[in-house]
């Protein structure tokens, strides 16, 4: 073979090997890229550099991709908690943000919801904390959900919230994190960090999440800063260690104002003048107690007293003097095993800042102020209270109450206001509307429907007397203002009052006679007290001769022959047309609950088979009223309610 041919063959072989090597590198590069695309988080191998003179996407795109992956890994490593969106949590502006279970419906517009949570895409919490404070890690606009704080402190500043967390490292609970509400100045302490399952962290405007860091070093620093802070600071109204003679007015929420204005302005002289026994309740009211069995107030024993009976404890707390020492008593614990009472100027959450602890031989008693007339008619000094319990299915009235005591007073005056006797109720502390629910039954009559409530902060209470209440011992027809209560087997709501009560309130003049009844209302001089707007009903009275006053309707079978009374002609008809029985009344009551009352306003409609009584929807009082003679039994046609159709 000529040398020229051998040289040409050698060159061809060399070029072929070079091409094969280049193709191999390209295949390896493509394979590596495919492997890396299958795993966005990590690159298993680095691609082989292309041969010199070959053009690709160049090193710039590869460099940018590598930086993107490294930034993603770094972000994941710095993320301290779980990321999720607002839609993962069912909550409202007035709701408890620490729970994610389904809540009661709220009267809340879409615009207010959007204002609260402006952009769903911005609900992801940033993972980088604020470390400007060496004692705490701060996560701005964040809250804890799926968890409940072990303690809530209201009307307190951020400095005191930090100090309390650092000081709460030993005991039943240890502060591991807290959430501070910058608007309402509420401090919620938690015994765990915010991302400890099942708890999670969520972005929430106006609230910040904190975790303590160097507790030992920061404790002295925080206490020193708190004690030396100027009076003009944000915490001027909440000193860390107030004297017992001037306790802080602790609120459960901004909706729970338990006589705040009265307690803030009341002086010792006013208390002394108002009551010889130094009762701190305002005029016209008297102290009584809500009792919680099986619990005591933890670490709040200002004074102790050995007694023979729990009534002695109540007397000492009402007088605000224990063992000769003045103490503005708000609650006390009674230990049955040692017959000892422990008094304190603090109350349990959500009204105060104290924490209840289970103890079998103890009972916790919290002071409240109720109408003096009710206390006098009901000798019982204690009323049952059950935190986080509710009675299901027997709500007769739902109303708005600014405080627990207002709701309790509403229950006491339920007959005058709503026409039924309230025996129990529930107050939802964190609701602004429809937060007071009154029941016609209680846990003793409906044990199977008495259950726990773990979503909202609520108190269940009962209004039961050891002896029947005067002129209200029997149950009235629920939901109906009973004008003719004698006819349905209950006592008549006719109480003779003078025009001026003991508390100084006055009554309007009696109305003109209508359907054999007269009404009058108490002058509403103070709209904060519900009893000021109470209503009374009585039989029509002849102003010329009061001796002619008598019951317009008498119980069936019990009509009396009285020679000193002039019997009207329609009484004869009433005796011939008997009054409804209890069974008939119960049946009508169930129909009203099931289908409502369908009758023209202010017209007396027939609801029973007899024509003795009917029902009327009074447009002025917004209540159902008993009325007489809805029909004439001698006529073949008459007006009747759709209840009978």
From Swiss-Prot:
Biased composition (Basic and acidic residues): 107-119, 556-567
Source superkingdom: Eukaryota
Pfam families, alphabetized: PAN_1
Glycosylated residues in this chain: 107, 421, 570
SMART domains: PAN_AP
Region of interest: Disordered: 30-58, 92-129, 225-247, 556-582
Domain PAN, first and last residues per copy: 135-214, 281-369, 378-465
Gene Ontology biological process terms, A to Z: anatomical structure morphogenesis
Keywords: Disulfide bond, Glycoprotein, Repeat, Signal
UniProt keyword annotation of Signal present: yes
Protein's name according to its UniProt entry: Uncharacterized protein F52C9.5
């Amino acid at each position: 073979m000529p040398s020229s041919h051998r040289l040409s063959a050698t060159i061809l072989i060399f070029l072929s090997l070079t091409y094969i090597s280049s193709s191999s590198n390209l295949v390896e590069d493509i394979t590596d890229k495919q492997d890396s695309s299958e795993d966005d988080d990590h690159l298993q191998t680095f691609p082989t550099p292309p041969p010199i003179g070959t053009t690709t996407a160049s090193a710039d795109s590869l460099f940018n991709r590598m930086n993107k992956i490294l930034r993603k890994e770094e972000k994941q490593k710095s993320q301290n908690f779980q990321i999720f969106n607002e839609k993962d949590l069912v909550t409202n502006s007035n709701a408890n943000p620490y729970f994610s279970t389904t809540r009661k419906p709220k009267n809340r517009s879409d615009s207010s919801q959007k204002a609260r949570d402006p952009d769903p895409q911005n609900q992801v919490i940033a993972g980088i904390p604020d470390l400007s404070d060496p004692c705490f890690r701060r996560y701005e606009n964040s809250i804890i959900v799926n968890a409940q704080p072990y303690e809530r402190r209201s009307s307190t500043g951020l400095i005191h919230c930090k100090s309390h967390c650092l000081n709460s490292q030993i005991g039943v609970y240890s502060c591991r994190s807290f959430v501070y509400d910058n608007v309402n100045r509420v401090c919620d302490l938690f015994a765990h960090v915010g991302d400890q399952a099942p708890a999670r962290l969520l972005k929430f405007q106006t609230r910040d999440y904190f975790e303590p860091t160097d507790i030992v070093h920061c404790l002295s620093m925080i206490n020193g800063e708190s004690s030396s802070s100027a009076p003009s600071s944000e915490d001027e109204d909440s000193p860390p260690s107030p004297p017992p003679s001037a306790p802080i007015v602790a609120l459960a929420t901004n909706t729970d104002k338990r006589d705040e204005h009265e307690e803030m302005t009341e002086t010792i002289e006013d208390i002394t003048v108002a009551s010889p026994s130094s009762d701190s309740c305002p005029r016209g009211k008297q102290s009584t107690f809500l009792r919680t069995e099986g619990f005591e107030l933890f670490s709040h024993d200002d004074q102790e007293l050995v007694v023979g009976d729990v009534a002695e404890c109540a007397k000492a707390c009402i007088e605000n003097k224990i063992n000769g020492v003045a103490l503005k008593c708000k609650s006390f614990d009674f230990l049955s095993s040692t017959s000892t009472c422990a008094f304190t100027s603090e109350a349990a959450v959500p009204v105060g800042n104290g924490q209840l602890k289970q103890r079998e031989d103890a009972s916790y008693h919290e002071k409240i102020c109720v109408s003096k007339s009710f206390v006098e008619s009901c000798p019982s000094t204690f009323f049952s209270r059950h935190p986080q319990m509710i009675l299901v299915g027997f709500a007769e009235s739902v109303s708005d109450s600014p405080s627990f005591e207002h709701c309790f007073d509403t229950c006491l005056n339920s007959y005058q206001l709503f026409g039924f006797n309230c025996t129990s109720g529930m107050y939802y502390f964190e609701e602004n509307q429809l937060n007071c629910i009154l029941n016609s039954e209680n846990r003793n009559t409906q044990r199977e429907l008495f259950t726990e409530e773990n979503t909202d902060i609520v108190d269940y209470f009962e209004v039961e007397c050891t002896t029947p209440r005067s002129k209200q011992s029997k149950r009235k027809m629920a939901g109906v203002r009973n004008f003719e209560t004698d006819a349905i087997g209950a006592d008549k709501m006719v109480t003779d009052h003078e025009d001026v009560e003991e508390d100084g309130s006055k009554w309007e003049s009696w109305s003109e006679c209508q359907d054999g009844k007269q009404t009058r209302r108490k002058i509403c001089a103070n709209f904060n007290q519900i009893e000021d707007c109470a209503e009374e009903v009585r039989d029509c009275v002849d102003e010329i001769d009061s001796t002619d006053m008598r019951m317009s309707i008498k119980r069936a079978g019990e009509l009396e022959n009285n020679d000193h009374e002039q019997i009207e002609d329609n009484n004869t008809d009433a005796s011939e047309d008997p009054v409804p029985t209890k069974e008939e009344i119960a049946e009508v009551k169930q129909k009203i609950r099931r289908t409502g009352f369908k009758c023209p306003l202010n017209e007396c409609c027939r609801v029973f088979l007899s024509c003795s009584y009917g029902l009327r929807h009074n447009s002025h009082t917004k209540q159902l009223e008993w009325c007489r003679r809805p029909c004439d039994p001698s006529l073949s046609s008459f007006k009747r309610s759709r209840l009978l159709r």
